[in-house]
Each structure stands twice: as structure tokens, then as C-alpha cells.
Amino acid sequence: MLPVIFFTVMAISVVIAFLARTGLKNMTVGEFLVGGRSFPAWLLYFLAVGEIYSIGTMIGFPSGIYAKGASYGIWFLGYILLAYPLGYFVAPLVWRAGVRYDAMTIPDVFGRHYRSRGLELVTAVGVLVALVPWGQYQFIGMQVVLGALGLSISPVQGVILAGVMAFLYLAVSGVRSPAFVAILKDSFMILGIVIAGIAAVVATGGIKETSGPQAVPHALVTMSGSPLVFAMTTIVVQSIAFYLGFSAMYLFTAKSERAVKSSTVWMPLYMLMYPFLVAVSYYALEAHPNVKNPNTIFMVATKGLLPDWLVGVVAAGAGLSGVLVLATTALAIGGVVSRNLVPNIRPESQRRWATVVIAVFLVAAAVLTLTGSTLMLTILNLVYYLLAQFVPGWLALMFFKRVQAWAVGTGLVVGIVASIVLYILNPSLGGVNLGLVTMLLNAVLTFGLSYLRPGPERLPMAQWTRGQKDVAERDVAQPVRD
């Protein structure tokens, strides 16, 4: 019964992906990548929360609490909560940049604002470096879900299934497919989390018995020293990077600034599901204390709490979460390669190129997952170390007039290289998040070099309105359109 429910829901999601194209006669690259900038607030909302509350919510969050204790749960919750008020003010500026430069990718914005093909290329490579481990993150989660189904399929077959579904989502409807599938995904994800959380509380005899000192070791729910410093600094860096990293692409799909703000207002409601996840995590600490792979703990606990058919519901929510974000990640990479990395591709050919790149990325990320799987929240940290490196460039184009393109590029390159080196070496630094260190280094280079040698004046996004051009912008060729 469990596999039947799981695969039925997956099949329904593919049908929804095909139906998402209804009414579209010509799938231009603009429709494919950013939905023609036509998404109303409600559709942007589902696309956005589909990205935010991914398989990391169901699989990675409990695994972090189970393996590392309270500090992982606190920073995971804290950075999302802080990101929303920041996003209410910052996200509309990202959308403005997309409209101003007819941008469909982050490199589009950086290259056109700073009038630098070199910076566009550097940004494109940086985005690719950041998004590949993010794709691996989704594949690892899918492996966990498929393994929990008890089917006689290998890890290779599992990642192939996830990759094929993600490709089908995108090949027919582009970004519209993930947007509409997100509605189905959210329904099953929330239902699965709530059911599992309630079952955990009932199984332990009540809330006090689930989270009280007799059930959860004191060391797992208290922080001091380095873990506390890590949690606080992680909240800061990841909340800042939240809307200035991979979230930019889905913001480009909105029809207006008002749609962006309206969708952001209601996103915190999804945080109500986290107490249920905490309940499952605490139940697992007592009921399953010796699980070797922490990534599996949510599904292990769920299988011990629920009948097979309800486990199928939970697994369907987790599976859709992984495939959905995997699809949007692949779409972002396809857009970057076809529009920014490979030169002189005609607009009418960019969609075909993007589709090919999507397929190549899915294969590459699957291979990386099979050969280098690790704890999910560890990979999440690496992703945010890398995404944080785009923050200085975004802040410069939003609020500053005379930042140099080469200074932004220098800061970006140094920040990315430093992030990878520090991730490999893993120095303690007193618990300070390594992404914060590298982001500050990046910012010092970006703004310090520009202070020493100011660039031409450019109107920042915070002061820009439609139809307005600054002096530097008048000399820029019009961006390529569909």
C-alpha cells in the first residue's frame, strides 16, 4: 500500500506539470525561465514556499537535531524567521532589478547593471558552483525517502527516478510546472508532518513526555560556547543570503512589486509545522537512539509510528519536496549556462540549450550524490557559504552608486574560493559561521576597492522606478529579449 500511494502521488504531479502549460501556444525562453513575469501573488507564494520548505524541512531538519542537538534546530528556525522581515524590503528590489534589466538570471542582473561581461561570467560560474551541491542536497533526501519505502531498488535507480521526474517537470512547462506542483507538494508535506508529529506525541504519552527532561538529554537542548556562537552567526549570514541567493530567480516570475510583498507576508505561517518536526525528532531520540545514518531518522520514526498507507502520504510529501526543488535548481542552472556562460546563443535557441543543460546537470548531480553523500545539514551550510558571496554585489547595486565591476568580481572570486577552502579545512574560529567570515572578506574587497577607486555613477535599485535611466545606463545596449 505504501509504494502505491507514493507512486500515485508522484504520477499525479507529472500530470499537473503537463497541465501547467495549458493555454500557452509559444514557450519562449522568458516563459520557460520566469513565466513571462506574470505570476500573481498566490502562485508566487506557492512557488516560493515550495523552494523554502524543501526536503531539508522534512529530512534535514530532524536529522540535524538528532545528530547535533538544539543548536542545529535553533539556527534552522532562526534564519528563516529573520529572513522574512528582511525579505519584505529586499525582495521587491530584486524584482525591480529583473524588470530594469530584463533579467532572468542573477548574472543577467550583475552583468547589465555593472556593464561588464567579465563580471557576468564570474557570477555565472559562482552560481553554478553554489547550485551543484544544492542539487546534491535534494538527491540525498530523495535517496532517504525511497530507501524508507522498502522497495528493492538501488540508490542508482532511486536518483535516476528523481532526475527523470525533475526533467519531465521542466521539459514541458518550464517554471510553471514547479509552481503548480508546489500546491500538491505543500498539501502532502504539511499533512505528513502534522500526522507524524501528532503520532509522536501520542506515542510518548503527551507533550511533556515528548520534550521534558526525562525524555531529551539536557546536553541536546542547551547551548553555550562555540555551538551558541555558531547558531547566532549562522542565523545572521543565512537570513541575509536567503533572498539574495537562489531565491532571486523565483522573484523574477512575479507580475509586480505588490505581488512580491503580498506573498512574503504570509510565508511565516508555514513555520507552524516545525513544532511537529521537533516532536518527531525528540521521539526518535528515545525510541531509535542508535540509528547510524541521521539523514534517515524522520522516515525511520514515521515507519515506527504510522501504518503503511500513512507512511506513503508522508513519503509522498517528502518526495515531492525533493523533486520540486531539484527541478527549480536545474532550471536556474540551465538558464545561467544558456544565457550567460555560452556566448552568442540566439534567444529563440536559449530554451533548447537550457533543456540540454538541465539534463546534463541532473546526471552530474546524481553522480556526485552517489559518490559523495554526507549529512544533509552539512551540505546546506556549504550552499549558504557560497550563496552568501552574492550579497555584497546585490547590496552594491541596490544601495550604492559608484561600486566598480572589477571590485565586485574580485570580492566574489575571493569569497567563493575562501568558502570552499574553509569548508574543506573546517577550522573552528570559535564557532563563527565560516560563511559570515568569507562574506565579510568579500564585502571588504568589494567596497574597499571601490572606495579607493570609485566607478562611474549608476542609479541604485532603491532609487529606481520604471522608465527612469541614469547617465551610465543610457549608453548600454538594450538587453536581449525573447
Predicted features and spans:
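Membrane-embedded helix-loop-helix hairpins and adjacent transmembrane boundary segments
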Residues: M1-D482
